[in-house]
Curated annotation (Swiss-Prot):
This is Ferrochelatase. InterPro entries: Ferrochelatase, Ferrochelatase_AS, Ferrochelatase_C, Ferrochelatase_N. It comes from Rhodopseudomonas palustris (strain TIE-1). It comes from the Bacteria. Its EC number is 4.98.1.1. Fe cation binds at H215, E296.
Length: 345
């Protein structure tokens, strides 16, 4: 009589769950509160990133911890308080980015294996938390969407840095894709042109010209090879062509300079002051590099620069809203996402 001896081997792993795909929208960041403490926490994280401030040597650390974080947070907190969404107790950037994710999810329809989420590079919800949450929900593939039309090492690249930093700690890593910049994508340019024309049509005055203001950057970063400036120029050139306006009717400037180094020029505030001094009385400003309204658009441009214009002779000023969670704005993101999800859906 033969005897069958059972062979005890390693347990067979269960079949993998159906693959899910995560889409993660990422914007720059925001403090959790508009008080000095909240802004200090945010600025510490932001200004400690070597992609933002490349020289993180002893002098910078002493300046950051000894001077900047003891003076700047109180001033910036007052600015945040001017534009804060008090109903939700959060910054407009957080409100809008959440809405962008929700509307994108709805526009993609009923796809049970597709999950749309959102995060901030600095502050909350953090990239780490949201990537870990998507993985916990079964996402084996992840599309990270930096919401910056123009690429910069200080924006898009640091999103990639942080995403891979999180993945480095995971044993079962999701496959990762990152959307490219979309600075002259036809859907983006069309949406900008339509938004500008629609806003101008709603005004009781006709601006003499439009200033296209982008976030600034140290000139040294461009000299090292960052393509940001060239992509900003390409956006404005495409927008001029799409709108049929002359170069001197749609100007390119750079805002939000910080510190003592030379930044990209011409500067927005100096340009707006000069225009008013030269006799321009009616002005519009659009911020094509911002996918959502934030401190730099709602306070710096719509309030500070409006005051500069009026103080030097201007009479009518308008800040054109960003694309935000408008139908056209969400459609830009949707087209970008669907293009990069090819082969995964």
């Amino acid at each position: 009589m033969s005897v069958i001896v059972p062979i005890h081997g390693p347990a067979i792993a269960p079949a993998p769950a159906p693959e899910r795909v995560g889409v993660l929208l990422v914007n720059l960041g925001t403090p959790d509160s508009c008080d000095t403490k909240g802004v200090r926490i945010y600025l510490r994280e932001f200004l400690s990133d070597p992609r933002v401030i490349e020289n993180q040597g002893l002098f910078w650390k002493l300046a950051l911890n000894g001077i900047i974080l003891n003076t700047r947070p109180a001033r910036k907190a007052k600015d945040y308080q001017k534009i804060w969404n008090h109903e939700k107790n959060e910054s407009p950037l957080k409100t809008i980015t959440r809405a962008q994710a929700e509307k994108l999810s709805a526009s993609l329809g009923d796809r049970g294996h597709l999950i749309v989420d959102w995060a901030m590079r600095y502050g909350n919800p953090s990239l780490r938390d949201r990537i870990e949450a998507l993985v916990a929900k079964g996402c084996s593939r992840l599309l990270v969407v930096p919401l910056y039309p123009q690429y910069s090492a200080a924006t898009s690249a640091t999103v990639c840095d942080q995403a891979f930093r999180v993945l480095r700690e995971l044993r079962a890593q999701p496959t990762l894709r990152v959307t490219p910049p979309y600075y002259r994508d036809s859907a983006y340019i069309d949406a900008l042109a339509t938004s500008i024309k629609s806003h101008l049509a709603s005004l009781t005055f006709e601006p003499e010209l439009i200033v296209a203001s982008f976030h600034g950057m140290p000139q040294a970063y461009i000299d090292k090879g960052d393509p940001y400036q060239a992509q900003c120029v390409a956006t404005v050139e495409a927008l001029r062509e799409r709108m049929g306006v002359a170069d001197d009717k749609l100007l390119l400037t750079f805002q939000s300079r910080f510190g003592f180094d030379q930044w990209l020029q011409p500067y927005t505030d100096k340009t707006i002051e000069a225009l008013a001094r030269k006799g321009v009385r009616k002005l519009a400003v659009v911020m094509p590099g911002f996918s959502a309204d934030c401190l730099e658009t709602l306070e710096e441009i719509a309030q500070e620069n409006a005051e500069i214009f009026m103080e030097h002779g201007g009479e009518e000023f308008t800040a054109i809203p960003c694309l935000n969670d408008s139908d056209a704005g969400v459609q830009v993101i949707r087209q970008l996402v669907l293009r990069e999800l090819q082969g995964w859906l």
